[in-house]
UniProtKB/Swiss-Prot annotation:
Entry's family note: Belongs to the ATPase B chain family.
Aminoacyl-tRNA synthetase recorded as keyword: no
Subcellular location: Cell inner membrane
Keyword Cell wall biogenesis/degradation: no
Subunit structure, interactors included: F-type ATPases have 2 components, F(1) - the catalytic core - and F(0) - the membrane proton channel. F(1) has five subunits: alpha(3), beta(3), gamma(1), delta(1), epsilon(1). F(0) has four main subunits: a(1), b(2) and c(10-14). The alpha and beta chains form an alternating ring which encloses part of the gamma chain. F(1) is attached to F(0) by a central stalk formed by the gamma and epsilon chains, while a peripheral stalk is formed by the delta and b chains.
Molecular function GO terms recorded: proton-transporting ATP synthase activity, rotational mechanism; proton-transporting ATPase activity, rotational mechanism
Gene that this polypeptide is encoded by: atpF
Broad class of the protein's primary localization: membrane
Record's keyword terms, sorted: ATP synthesis, Cell inner membrane, Cell membrane, CF(0), Hydrogen ion transport, Ion transport, Membrane, Transmembrane, Transmembrane helix, Transport
Top-level taxon in the UniProt lineage: Bacteria
Protein name per UniProt: ATP synthase subunit b
Length: 175
């Protein structure tokens, strides 16, 4: 009851007391001035330092992003150049292979023509030799035939014997 009597005498908790309001305001201003002198500067400087740190981090992040994009562009350019270079190398390789194939085909064709010409020359020489041998044999046969004709008379039986003899001689010379 004592507490309720004090509350009733002072006018209650919700009724304003001008002295209390004054001293509360004075105390608040004094605490505010003390905080401003002692704590406000360090708090503001800490906030400013934190803001600078955050801004620096943001700037570094943008810088890193820009650098990464530049590296990405450079890598893409290098990849495109490498693709072009590989296409050029492949194209040159194909061209070289085709040129080499063509040169080899031309060389083989030249060698074949050379071999054919050599074979034709050899055949022609063999043909000449065979004709020479044949001429010699025909001349020998003609001479032998003429000798036999001169030595014997020319009746039908004699002629037949001479021809048969010449054929046998020719056959024996060939073997």
């Amino acid at each position: 009851m004592l507490t309720s009597g004090i509350i009733l005498l002072s006018g209650g908790l919700l009724s304003p007391n001008p002295g209390l309001i004054f001293w509360t305001a004075v105390t608040f201003v004094i605490v505010l001035l003390i905080l401003k002198q002692l704590a406000w500067g360090p708090i503001i400087s800490a906030l400013e330092e934190r803001e600078k740190g955050i801004q620096s981090s943001i700037d570094r992040a943008y810088s890193a992003k820009d650098e990464a994009e530049a590296i990405l562009r450079k890598n893409r350019d290098m990849l495109a150049k490498a693709d072009l270079e590989s296409e050029r190398i492949i194209r040159e390789g194909k061209e070289y292979g085709e040129k080499l194939r063509q040169e080899m085909a031309e060389k083989a064709q030249f060698e074949a023509k050379k071999m054919i010409a050599s074979a034709k020359d050899e055949i022609e020489q063999e043909k000449r030799r065979a004709l020479d041998v044949l001429r010699n044999e025909v001349a020998d046969l003609a001479i032998m035939g003429a000798e036999k004709i001169i030595k014997s008379s020319l009746d039908a039986d004699t002629q037949k014997k001479i021809v048969d003899s010449m054929i046998r001689d020719l056959a024996s010379k060939r073997n």
